[in-house]
Amino acid sequence: MDALEARYRPLVDALRSASPAGAAGLVAVSKTQPAGAVRALAALGQRAFGENYVQEALAKQRELADLDLEWHLIGPLQSNKCREAARHFDWVQSVDRAKLLPLLDRERPAERGPLNVLLQVNIDDEPSKSGCAPGDAMALADEAAALPRLRLRGLMAIPEPHPDE
């Protein structure tokens, strides 16, 4: 067992034992990692990978096209990247404003099925974090749910760190 497997297996085992079958999954954040590292983790059974940058992800996707992987965009999404995000990702976890929704819906190829989206909510009103205000989340959810090529799957939020807890 190599070092990667030694770190990965206990994590996956703990996840499986803590949740009913299929109730929780692991998205391995592969941003800044080379395609070879993604391939190595895929060989251990990991299928979902998270990327921050559309262009970096597209290069990896081309290099790893022979693998059946699920790609998540976890970084901020600019409107000029919606076309590539809608066409090449399975999930966009960082929808933080209404302007992105019709762009993603329009650019999603019908043959790929609906694009899974998470609405990013800035729950602590941190200036350094992206996300819509909590009070705007329901209106954003209603807009997302009305679009046929998007599948609203939930929320994504990163709470403010509390080192004393």
Locate the predicted segments by residue:
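Conserved alpha/beta-domain cores
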Residues: 1-165
